Design a protein with these regions (language model features):
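Active-site beta-loop-alpha junctions enriched in small/polar residues
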Residues: 5-7, 35-37, 62-64, 103-109, ...
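Short, charged, surface-exposed secondary-structure boundary motifs
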Residues: 10-13, 139, 194-200
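Short glycine-enriched, charge-decorated loop/helix-capping segments at active-site entrances
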Residues: 17-19, 72-78, 138, 202-203
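Alpha/beta catalytic cores of nucleotide-metabolism and tRNA/nucleoside-modifying enzymes
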Residues: 90, 99, 111-128, 147, ...
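Hydrophobic faces of well-ordered beta-strands that scaffold small-molecule active sites
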Residues: 1-3, 30-34, 57-59, 100-104, ...
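Pocket-edge positions in alpha/beta enzyme catalytic cores
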Residues: 34, 76, 208-211
Length: 230
């Protein structure tokens, strides 16, 4: 997934356009993500995605950044179910050749907001939902709300992907065992702290210090090689 693309001062930010350029993402199955407070801005971004040849689009209903949320972007739209309905139904109705997914939080003020949206979400032909079980007003502070996530998980009829506070192999194992019907787990910030976390989970144990150093050496060499090509 790309960082979200958004409209600023009536135009798509040039930085965001660079992020989704296929030439900058060789060898990656990339899904662009958008964030928008209304249908008009969303359509401007989707038009760019279509121009670039993308067939899958992720809609961000999770960003907690206050300056965006107060304008009903990201998780700031979750308390307004009619706005969510208008945005998502327009995307699907206007673009039948595209596949849409949603990344979201439990709510802005309380987890009942996501539960109130479930009848709408369940009836839409989404490919999947990615859920970060915090409230928008928390930003990244406090604890994830696993009880709130469980309530959503139990009623969600779409493939559901968990995201949030996965920093160790044990964290990933705990979530996958507690929620066995998950379609996937999105590690996110845990990979910044430990780039080998996904590999360690696959292997079932942490890498040795020697193995980690060797893999980091190879990773850096690959980054430099790709940079020289660009």
């Amino acid at each position: 997934y790309t960082p979200f693309v958004r409209v600023e001062h009536g135009e798509i930010r040039k930085k965001d356009m660079r992020e989704i350029t296929l030439e900058n993402n060789r060898g990656v199955q990339l899904i662009p993500q958008l964030i928008a407070p209304d249908v008009d801005k969303m359509e401007l971004i989707i038009a760019l995605f279509i121009e670039k040849g993308y067939k899958n689009v992720d809609i961000n209903l999770g960003c907690p950044f206050p300056l965006l949320a107060k304008r009903h972007n990201g998780s700031g739209m979750l308390p307004y179910p009619e706005e969510v309905r208008e945005l998502l139904t327009a995307a699907i109705k206007n673009h039948p050749d595209l596949q849409f997914s949603v990344k979201m939080r439990l709510g802005w003020e309380n987890p009942e907001e996501s539960l109130a949206l479930l009848p709408l979400l369940n009836e839409l032909p989404l490919t999947h939902i990615i859920m970060h079980p915090r409230l928008g007003k928390q930003q990244y502070k406090g604890e994830v709300d696993l009880k709130g996530f469980e309530a959503f998980y139990n009623e969600c009829r779409h493939p559901l992907i968990y995201n949030g506070d996965l920093l160790t192999v044990e964290d990933i194992q705990t979530i996958s065992e507690r929620f066995p019907r998950l379609a996937g787990i999105m590690i996110g910030r845990g990979l910044l702290a430990n780039p080998a976390l996904a590999l360690e989970y696959q292997q079932g144990h942490p890498l040795s210090e020697k193995d980690m150093q060797e893999r980091l050496r190879l990773f850096h060499a690959d980054v430099l090689d790709r940079k020289s090509v660009v």
